[in-house]
Structure formats: C-alpha cells, structure tokens
C-alpha cells in the first residue's frame, strides 16, 4: 500500500520533499494534500506538484482522512503548533529538524505523540544516507580502533538569507546547521549524554548566534567538537578518529555521498532525479528518510530506531545548554 502524505507548509524544503516523493514509486508513496496559511500559495504548490488537494489552513489538512502521515516543513518556531495539531488529529508525523526551538517544546511534542501512540520522528535525513550507514558499519566493526574524537564543521555565508538572521524566527547557526554536527557526534557516541558541554560564540547583530564552537566531553574520556557559522565558509566535513585511523565524510557532510576510511575513498551516488531541480543540495537524498518512515509504519513502530525520540530530546537539551553558555535566547524561550 502506498503511504499517503500531507505536506504542511508550501516553502522551499516542502517543495524539495514533494519533488522527491513524486520520483518514488506511486505504489509506495503518494502526496494527497498540501496546506499553507495562504490558500493561493497552497493551490500554486498543488498545481506545480500535481497534488489533488490544497488547503488554506493546517487544521483542514490535519482533519483530512486521506492523510496518513504529515510532513512538517514550516520554520522551526511553527513546528510545535503544527505537530500538535496533526498528532491531535491522529496523524503520524515527520517533523523537520530542529524539532523545536528549545527542549520544552520538544518534550511537549514527544509526550503528545507517546500518549496518543502515534509515530513521530525528527527529519534528520542525514542519518539515512548510505555514506552515513557505511560509517556506522565501520564504527561497529572497530575499524578505527578505540575512538578518541569526532570533529564536525558546517558553515556558509547565509547572512543574505532572511530566516538565517531572523531572531523572531529563532534563526542563527546552531538550530539550522549546528544540529547536523551535533547529531553526528551523538550518533558516533551512541546517543549518550555528554558529561560536560562548553561553548564559545559570536552573536550576529540581529541577536542570533553567528559562529559557535562547542566541545562535548563524553563518558570514557572521548570527546567531540563542532563549529557552525552563518557568516563564514567552513570545511563542511566530519571526521571520526581512533587509535587505528580516521574516517571522514566529505563536503557536503549534511547530505554526504563520499566516505573516506583510512585514506580509501568510497562513493555513494544519489538516486537519479532526471530533469528535477531542488532548492537544497542533494535533495533527492530525502528519499532515504521517506523510505525509512514507510518501513517504520509498516512495522507498526511509534518511533525510529535510527533517530529515537529520546535522542531528539537530548539534542534539544544540548543545543539549549549551548545557547545558554553563549547568551543566546529566543522569543520562544520561557524566561
């Protein structure tokens, strides 16, 4: 049976997600509805992507009995309201990262999903890329020896992109880019809670975080560090180092197709998307997470074993602690 998707928000990421879904077999995935807060935008989106139904409110999509799973592609401060709306209506939910602006928002969403027994997942699409799965295998086999350190960087000049610097919309590098780096470190160290978190950072003139470096000390004397920036170009790579060697995910590390293990290059090409244009790099790679959601639902799972909800909560806790350390608060934070 095809999984029937409803797309919440008609923005750029939703467009890429929908373009990708339409490339997958119709026997497995179908987009049945889209909702925007402006009906004309929803209709335009529906026309572009050949979606049967367009709604001018998220409520209408949540109530649509044809929708099995809602994809939440709004800006992050709007995630919580949209997620709760869809969960209350009995829908499974795939919510874009970061799940929430702060830990309290994430806990509220997770509690709602659990109390209703509904599938809920944070769309950390990176984890499902074959290059990242290959890295996990390398780690599981002990190829790198005893692990010592994970390092990640994600930065580019986004100061011309309004949402990146918009304080009211919880912009900045940490929630948008840093979460990719952080989830890599967390993945390598098995979703453990860090023993110590330290951070330094620069504020952007709008009040969001501009460039931040974080060090995370984990049990067993291992650590991870990452730098994220919305104003400077960084290497956009991840390295995992141990006593027997190093593995690297090359740029673009958030949607990687190349893994280097002890100097040996391996390529993992994306599925073909002939004639399709994406707003974001390697957009067709979202297909890996979409397939995962379908598999989880077919198995009757309520959460992903690859990105469990407890880890989404942990990532939110760490990002909040980092923001406190560098003095960044957003209007969504409860003071």
UniProtKB/Swiss-Prot annotation:
One matching Pfam family is: GFO_IDH_MocA
Highest taxon of source = Eukaryota
Reaction catalyzed = (1R,2R)-1,2-dihydrobenzene-1,2-diol + NADP(+) = catechol + NADPH + H(+); D-xylose + NADP(+) = D-xylono-1,5-lactone + NADPH + H(+)
Question: Which UniProt keyword terms apply here?
Answer: NADP, Oxidoreductase
Q: What class of enzyme is it?
A: oxidoreductase
Q: Where is this site: May play an important role for the adaptation of the alcohol substrate into the binding site?
A: 176
Provide a GO biological process annotation: D-xylose catabolic process
At what residues does the UniProt record annotate the site feature described as May play an important role in coenzyme binding? 71, 79, 97
GO molecular function ontology, one term from the record: trans-1,2-dihydrobenzene-1,2-diol dehydrogenase activity
Q: Where are the residues marked May play an important role in catalytic activity as a site?
A: 180
The record's annotation in InterPro entries points to:
Gfo/Idh/MocA-like_OxRdtase_N, Gfo/Idh/MocA_domain, GFO_IDH_MocA-like_dom, NAD(P)-bd_dom_sf
* EC number(s) reported in the record: 1.3.1.20, 1.1.1.179
Q: How does it assemble?
A: Homodimer.
Which family does this protein fall into? Belongs to the Gfo/Idh/MocA family.
Q: What is this protein called?
A: Trans-1,2-dihydrobenzene-1,2-diol dehydrogenase
């Amino acid at each position: 049976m095809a999984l029937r998707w409803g797309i919440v928000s008609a923005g750029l990421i939703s467009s890429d997600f929908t373009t990708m879904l339409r490339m997958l077999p119709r026997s497995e995935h179908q987009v049945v509805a889209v909702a925007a807060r402006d009906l004309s935008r929803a209709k335009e989106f529906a026309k572009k992507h050949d979606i049967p139904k367009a709604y001018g409110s998220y409520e209408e999509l949540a109530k649509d009995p044809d929708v099995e799973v809602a994809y939440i592609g709004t800006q992050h401060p709007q995630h919580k309201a949209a997620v709760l709306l869809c969960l209350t209506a009995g829908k499974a939910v795939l919510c874009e990262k970061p799940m929430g602006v702060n830990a309290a928002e994430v806990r509220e969403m997770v509690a709602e999903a659990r109390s209703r027994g509904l599938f809920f997942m944070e769309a950390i699409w990176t984890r499902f890329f074959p290059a990242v799965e290959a890295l996990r295998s390398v780690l599981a086999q002990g190829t790198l020896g005893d692990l010592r350190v994970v390092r990640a960087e994600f930065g580019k000049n986004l100061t011309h992109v309004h949402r990146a610097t918009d304080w009211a919309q919880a912009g900045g590098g940490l929630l948008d880019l840093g979460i990719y780096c952080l989830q890599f470190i967390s993945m390598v160290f098995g979703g453990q809670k860090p023993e110590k978190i330290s951070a330094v950072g620069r504020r952007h003139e709008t009040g969001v975080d501009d460039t931040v470096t974080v060090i995370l000390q984990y049990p067993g004397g291992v650590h991870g560090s990452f730098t994220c920036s919305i104003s400077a170009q960084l290497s956009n790579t991840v390295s995992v180092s141990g006593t027997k060697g190093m593995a690297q995910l090359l740029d673009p590390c958030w949607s990687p197709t190349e893994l280097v293990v002890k100097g040996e290059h391996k390529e993992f090409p994306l599925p073909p998307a002939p004639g399709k244009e994406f707003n974001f790099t390697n957009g067709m790679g979202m297909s890996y997470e979409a397939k995962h959601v379908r598999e989880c639902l077919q198995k009757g799972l309520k959460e992903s074993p690859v990105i469990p909800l407890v880890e989404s909560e942990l990532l939110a806790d760490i990002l909040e602690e980092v923001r406190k350390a560098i003095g960044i608060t957003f209007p969504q934070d409860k003071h």
